[in-house]
Regions:
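Interdomain "pre-motor" coupling segment immediately N-terminal to P-loop NTPase/helicase cores
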Residues: 31-112
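Conserved helicase motor core of P-loop NTPases
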Residues: 116, 279, 283-422
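N-terminal pre-P-loop "Q-motif" helix
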Residues: 131-148
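Conserved lysine of the Walker
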Residues: 162
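Hydrophobic positions on the alpha1 helix immediately C-terminal to the Walker A/P-loop
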Residues: 165, 169
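Inter-Walker segment of RecA-like/P-loop motor cores
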Residues: 184-244
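Short basic/glycine-enriched coil/helix segment immediately N-terminal to the Walker B
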Residues: 212, 229-244, 254-255, 260-270, ...
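Walker B catalytic acidic pair
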Residues: 249-250, 276
Length: 422
């Protein structure tokens, strides 16, 4: 009782934002160590308590073998998700899914259709700050991952073409399908995100000359079937979702409980495609699922030897980065990070700056900001509080004034919205 609350407040984050599975550091600050008993004493004390159990037991609190203390419900959510991810990365289970998938796909037309939906070399690029490397077309590789894997995570910053890649991969999947039209569900965490996903997918289909290939996008809650007054959904292990492919956009906003319930509702033969940016829009509730799946910024696009060979054979992409690790995570072949930005030039000032910020390269950030070569960005010293409104007015008001004038003139609504979204 003497220590009740203090170490838990220090060691366990109430609302973890990221790295929720990170182990505690070996060396703790002395100020914390002085107020905490040894870890072994904590474990013994907790396990002696009737409300604390170990994984597999049904008790209010669960203490795992890495000394992480969970509410049972959240341990169960995490366990469900971990089991699903491991099954997707398990070689035997992955091969079973692949064989079932291949029976329903006519792969003889893969090469021709891949070039149709992903024009040759359109996605290859070099970075100005690393001209020695030519990067492959990650969109093509993501499309191949969608064909071969049950779970695929397509990550990337805004403008890298995540939605376009998903739409083209789905179109490719549909063209290669031997059976009836694929049943595809589109979902997002919020209603607004679902509307934008709908617009983006239809626009992407139109660019490759295809009609609408799926129904309306919906929220994840609506997809699962909300039950009034209940934390459970209509769809679950005993009543799986009736879809062949499920695409979830803005997946970084999906929290741990909702993601666990989503994977529980998948049928054994269905594919799950998660789209999102690990550096943006974290979930409000506990559990940074997408961020934990993607790992650190430099951990993406490292594949197994078998998948690397398949990429070369099926797509012709050979400029793959060397794998710096001896052992890769089981789901590494399911994780594709898009890097080429179609919203702005990767070698522009904003392109170089965004990469430096994501890498945490402080020196490079200030070098770019102070460079006279980057005309699209400017370094502004923050004025005193009284001067801040004037600085904002000088830089922003004229844009808003033009927008308001378009509204007053009753211009075409599409033109107004396009201008407002710039």
């Amino acid at each position: 009782a003497e220590y009740a609350g203090r170490p838990l407040m220090a060691d366990i984050r109430e609302e973890p934002e990221d790295e929720i599975l990170e182990e505690m550091p070996e060396e703790m600050p002395e100020s914390i160590l002085l107020s905490c008993p040894p870890l072994s004493i904590w474990r013994e004390t907790l396990l002696a308590c009737s409300v604390v159990g170990t994984p597999g037991e049904y008790k209010p609190l669960i203490l795992d073998d890495k000394s992480r203390l969970y509410l049972y419900r959240y341990w169960s959510y995490e366990d469900t998700l971990v089991r699903f991810i491991k099954s997707c990365g398990n070689p035997a289970e992955s091969e079973d899914f692949r064989q079932i998938s291949n029976l329903s796909l006519d792969l003889s037309g893969f090469g021709h259709n891949l070039q149709t939906f992903f024009p040759e070399d359109a996605g290859q690029f070099r970075f100005e700050d690393d001209k020695s490397k030519i990067f492959p077309d990650w969109q093509k590789i993501a499309a191949l991952a969608v064909l071969r894997n049950r779970l695929v995570v397509i990550s990337g910053s805004p403008g890298t073409g995540k939605t376009t890649t998903a739409a083209r991969a789905l179109a490719l999947l549909q063209v290669l399908s031997r059976g009836p039209k694929l049943r595809i569900a589109l979902a997002a965490p919020t209603g607004k995100a679902a509307v934008r996903l709908d617009e983006a997918m239809n626009s992407a289909y139109a660019r490759v000359g295809l009609n609408d290939q799926q129904g309306k996008a919906m929220t994840v809650h609506r997809l699962l079937g909300t039950v009034a007054g209940s934390p459970y959904f209509r769809h679950g292990p005993g009543n799986p979702l009736p879809y062949d492919v499920i695409v979830v956009d803005e997946a970084s906003m999906v929290d741990l409980p909702l993601m666990a319930k989503l994977v529980q509702a998948l049928s054994p033969a269905s594919r799950l495609i998660l789209l999102g940016d690990r550096d943006q829009l974290a979930s409000v509730e506990a559990g940074a699922v997408l961020g934990d799946l993607c790992g650190p910024d430099d951990a993406g696009n490292f594949f197994s030897q078998a998948f690397r060979q398949e990429i070369r054979r099926m797509t012709g992409e050979s400029c793959l980065p060397p794998v710096p690790f001896r052992h890769l995570p089981p789901v590494s072949d399911s994780m594709v990070q898009l890097q080429k930005n179609y919203r702005f030039d990767e070698n522009s000032g904003i392109g170089q700056l965004s990469r430096a910020v994501n890498r945490g390269d402080k020196d490079r950030v200030f070098s770019i900001l102070n460079s006279s070569r980057c005309s699209d960005i400017a370094w502004e010293n923050l004025p005193d509080p009284l001067g801040l409104p004037r600085l904002i007015e000088e830089n922003l008001i004229h844009y808003f004034r033009k927008y308001m004038q378009m509204v007053i003139n009753n211009d075409n609504p599409e033109v107004i919205f396009d201008y407002f979204e710039r």
